């Protein structure tokens, strides 16, 4: 790692490296508060606006913590959220607001190719002075910081490094006669068949917006291509028009045809279908550590009735999908100092724990084995394994949108797996040339 994010960087990041980066966090620092940067600022104001994509359950926790900050800082913060839309809609909504001059003071965003355009357009402030003032370099996972650093500019502050696993309902697995976590892709297919025979839809996923059902395809690609080739595909260094990609698309269609995913999955909203494993309507979903708070605890269920395992790929290293999320400050904010203070408040260990961040980048906010046993279990096992960058963060928005359209066309039977592979190569190669 070099401290500079490029479109070819942050691929195949080791979760163990993230853990090492967090272990290196030790203390704080002080420096003069910086002024706003990047164009004409709005008039100074104690009215702040925060833009997010939290779910309804997590949004209430966030609002509670921001209200505490407002009471201390004398600010009034409006919190807006666009839940469930993911990278397919949220960045465009944010970009439209910023171009219209009415963007938020603080916004949440993914790293990689989703966050990068806001830095290139100088809409996001260079936060280096605030890193110095608040000592973020020594309090926040240093490897995760690289995921929010763009061409040397620390334009974001990471608060979480997420990882995708299979979160499942133990009682439904038991009903289907599944006694052990699948240890190979073949065993996962066998588990799907057992669940289906027991009258249970195996995997909860939704294709609205494209990004949720993408989690299934990227897993299938990791399985068919292996780590080295998968990384090269994501960076445009190898052709997608190849047998391994065709195999992944073939298996992707198979999951639909075998009814291992819900009927009409393409039209389902992720925020509606993902928690269905907690409700007993599906057996498992592909999601991250936030599921413990947002799905299980929010439904007042016992975490002991659920489990999580790493989707088996048959490769060494055994990897899963992962990504970084953080906060940016509007370069035209009327009060960048208060905006930075608000972010710093959110990044306090006690605030992170109150927000139930199961994969926090903040030293001292690691998962509690008592209150978040599943997140802790993940952090001590699969969480120490390497991960590859989630595909809608590895690609710029235009390519991701093309990718989602190809997924959709394949599942609708409009194109074959071979045609899907060729179309992916066309989309990725056009980007890689630039």
Give residue spans per PLM region:
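Glycine-centered hinge/linker elements that transmit conformational signals in sensory
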Residues: 192-194, 234-265
């Amino acid at each position: 790692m070099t401290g500079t994010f490029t479109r070819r960087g942050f691929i195949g990041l080791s979760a163990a490296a993230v853990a090492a980066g967090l272990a290196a966090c030790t203390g704080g620092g002080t420096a003069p508060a910086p002024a706003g940067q990047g164009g004409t600022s709005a008039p100074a104001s104690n009215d702040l606006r925060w833009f997010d994509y939290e779910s309804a359950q997590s949004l209430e926790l966030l609002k509670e913590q921001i209200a505490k900050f407002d009471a201390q800082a004398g600010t009034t913060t409006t919190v807006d959220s666009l839940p469930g839309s993911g990278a397919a809609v949220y960045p465009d909504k944010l970009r439209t607001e910023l171009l219209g001059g009415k963007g938020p003071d603080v916004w949440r965003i993914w790293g990689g190719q989703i966050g990068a355009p806001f830095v290139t357009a100088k809409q996001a402030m260079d936060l280096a002075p605030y890193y110095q003032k608040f000592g973020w370099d020594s309090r926040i996972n240093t490897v995760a910081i690289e995921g929010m650093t763009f061409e040397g500019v620390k334009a974001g502050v990471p608060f979480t490094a997420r990882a995708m696993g299979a979160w499942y309902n133990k009682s439904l697995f038991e009903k289907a006669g599944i006694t052990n976590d699948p240890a190979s892709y073949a065993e996962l297919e066998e588990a799907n068949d057992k669940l289906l025979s027991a009258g249970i839809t195996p995997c909860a996923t939704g294709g609205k917006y494209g990004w949720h059902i993408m989690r299934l395809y990227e897993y299938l690609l990791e399985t068919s291509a292996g780590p080295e080739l998968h990384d090269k595909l994501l960076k445009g260094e190898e052709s997608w028009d190849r047998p391994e990609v065709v195999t992944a698309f073939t298996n992707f269609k198979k999951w639909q045809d075998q009814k291992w995913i819900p009927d009409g999955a393409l039209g389902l909203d992720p925020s509606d279908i993902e928690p269905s494993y907690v409700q007993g309507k599906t057996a498992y979903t592909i999601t991250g550590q936030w599921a413990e708070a947002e799905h299980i605890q929010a439904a007042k269920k016992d975490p002991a009735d659920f489990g999580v395992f790493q989707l088996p790929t048959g490769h060494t290293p055994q990897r899963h999908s992962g990504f970084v999320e953080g906060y940016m400050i509007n370069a035209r904010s009327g009060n960048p100092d208060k905006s930075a203070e608000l972010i710093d408040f959110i990044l306090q260990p006690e605030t992170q724990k109150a927000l139930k961040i199961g994969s926090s980048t903040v030293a001292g906010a690691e998962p509690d084995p008592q209150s978040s046993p599943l997140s802790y279990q993940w952090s001590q096992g699969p969480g120490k394994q390497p991960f590859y960058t989630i595909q809608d963060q590895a690609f710029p928005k235009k390519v991701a949108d093309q990718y989602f359209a190809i997924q959709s066309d394949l599942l609708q039977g409009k194109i074959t797996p071979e045609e899907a592979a060729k179309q992916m190569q066309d989309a990725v190669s056009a980007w890689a040339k630039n």
